UniProtKB/Swiss-Prot annotation:
Keywords: Amino-acid biosynthesis, Cytoplasm, Glutamine amidotransferase, Histidine biosynthesis, Hydrolase, Lyase
Name assigned to this protein: Imidazole glycerol phosphate synthase subunit HisH
GO cellular component: cytoplasm
Location of the Glutamine amidotransferase type-1 domain: 4-203
Length: 203
C-alpha cells in the first residue's frame, strides 16, 4: 500500500534530514502546513529543534495548533516535537523561568533534566528500555543506541513506551492514542533509527 506521508512544516531546522531519512526507506514524503494535505496523510511527522517557546510561537503563527489536534492518523513527534505533545514545558529561551503551554495531547510536563554531575545538554548516544512488545521498536535490538541532544525531558508516566537514564529516568518514547513521540533523533540514529521510522510508517 502506498503511504501518504507528510512532515508538518513547523519551520524548524531538521525537517530536511527527517525527509531524507524517510526517502531512504523508499517512501515519498511531502512537507506541508496545508490543512487539506495534513488531514489527508496516512502518517505524519512533527519535527522540532530549538526551544519550546519559539516552537509554540511558530505553530501559532502558522495556524498549526488546532490542525495538529485534529489529526486522527498516527503522528510522530521528534525531539522537541515530542515535548510539544505534552501539557507544558519549562523551556523558555536559555532559562527555565516561565511555563510554556504546549499542545496538551499527552499528559506529561516537560522539565529541566536533573543530572547531578553529568553535563547538560544530554548529547550523544544512549540506550533505552522499551515497554515489551511495542510495535514502534519491532526488530530493534534491546541494547541499540539512539542519538540524543536535549536538556529538557518528559518524566516517565503511563504514556511512556521507552525510557532512558541520564542522571534521572525520563521518557525516550511516548504514545497517547494516535500520537507518538521520541526524544532522540531517529534520523541521526543509524540502523536502529531507520528501523524505528520504518516501524512507524508500517503501523
Amino acid at each position: 500500500m502506498t503511504q501518504n506521508v507528510v512532515i508538518i512544516d513547523t519551520g524548524c531546522a531538521n525537517i530536511s534530514s527527517v525527509k531524507f531519512a524517510i526517502e531512504r526507506l523508499g517512501y515519498a514524503v511531502t512537507i506541508s502546513r496545508d490543512p487539506q494535505v495534513v488531514l489527508a496523510a496516512d502518517k505524519l511527522f512533527l519535527p522540532g529543534v530549538g526551544t519550546a517557546s519559539e516552537a509554540m510561537k511558530n505553530l501559532t503563527e502558522r495556524d498549526l495548533i488546532e490542525l495538529v489536534k485534529r489529526v486522527e492518523k498516527p503522528l510522530l513527534g521528534i525531539c522537541l516535537g515530542m515535548q510539544l505533545l505534552g501539557k507544558l514545558s519549562e523551556e523558555k529561551g536559555q532559562k527555565a523561568d516561565e511555563i510554556v503551554q504546549c499542545l496538551g495531547l499527552v499528559d506529561g510536563e516537560v522539565r529541566l533534566l536533573q543530572t547531578g554531575d553529568l553535563p547538560l545538554p544530554h548529547m550523544g548516544w544512549n540506550t533505552v528500555q522499551v515497554k515489551e512488545g511495542h510495535p514502534l521498536f519491532n526488530g530493534i535490538e534491546p541494547d541499540a543506541y539512539f542519538y540524543f541532544v536535549h536538556s529538557f525531558a518528559m518524566p516517565v508516566g503511563d504514556y511512556t513506551i521507552a525510557q532512558c537514564e541520564y542522571g534521572q529516568p525520563f521518557s525516550a518514547a511516548i504514545q497517547a492514542g494516535n500520537y507518538y513521540g521520541v526524544q532522540f533523533h531517529p534520523e541521526r540514529s543509524s540502523k536502529a533509527g531507520a528501523r524505528l521510522i520504518q516501524n512507524f510508517l508500517e503501523l
